[in-house]
Amino acid sequence: MGRGLLLGAVLCLGLECLPQVASAKVLRVPEKLATIQAAVDAARNGDEIRVSPGAYCGATIDKRVELVGVGHPRIIGCAGGPVLGVARVGFYLPGPNGKNPASGTKISGFVFDGRGVSSANLEPISFGIFARFARDIEISHNHFEGTAQAITSTGGDRWRIEHNRIHDLTVLDCTGPCTGGDGIVIQLARDEVAAPGGDAAPINRPEDNLILGNTIEGGPPDGFADFSMVGILILAADHTTVLQNDLRLRDNPAAAAVSQGILLTNTCCGTGKSYLPGVRHTILAFNDGRKSEVAIVVEGSGGANTQGLFLFRNRGEQQLETAQLLLSLSRSAAIPASARPQL
């Protein structure tokens, strides 16, 4: 009897009684599932969704998955796809109530087609990838064409945004939604989106995010003067690292709006409200903003956005806690407001 029990214990430890661990599946679009949304709905946490060449509507991501584009599939605006207000979104990770079940998601190899988007034409994608309160997200090797806001993390921690290309970045002017003009946004969860605890609460503040090796190009349309355009916007965030990005936010002499490669700020949206604490412990190194109107802008005064700031070998004009007066000397319009990202 003793030997039988011992043998049973050995078998249990070796094979029989170990918990079954489900292996990740690969769900293929369109070979097995017609749409990306159908694949997300069918997936379990940890599954891979592999998308073949073609044009596809966007999707709402509500679980941890790896989205892999093979042959640069295009994500287009669709009437049945995710929206923010009236604007269409490519991949939307909503994160209600300060929690996001899609944390840990990876997205690579897609083309987000926002060509021609404007306040007068909201059929293309306005926002490429948009998330709230998501953690440990990896966004790499994607192309964004047009769009008013390519990659957005609101209140998200430990993102890796690497080797993406954003071309023809534009805005949704104030004849309509009045937002956008930002390539990559790392921003405080604030106002109606914020979780309890206020602006200083860790749950609302983005932390430990990396933005590496991206190319961002765009500029304001003629006559645009409502707010600035920004390649990389850091709004009241902590421990953000921004390395080796190529920033081409060109000047448009026919527009009063300022084009900024990287902006660190604790104000936005024309309200005059400051969010405190401001930007803290930021590393900006090896970024090239020579083809931007201004490469780096750090707004504020009295160190509001310079606590722990480290700058190293960035190229292009840099303005640290200085008024933007010089940028408007040759323009009759008033100095535009700071950035106005979609929240």
Language model region names:
Residues 68-72, 100-114, 135-146, 157-173, ...:
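Right-handed parallel beta-helix
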Residues 79-98, 120-132, 145-153, 170-203, ...:
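Extracellular beta-strand/beta-solenoid scaffold signature
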Residues 37, 41, 45, 55-68, ...:
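Extracellular beta-strand-rich solenoid/capping regions of secreted or surface-exposed proteins
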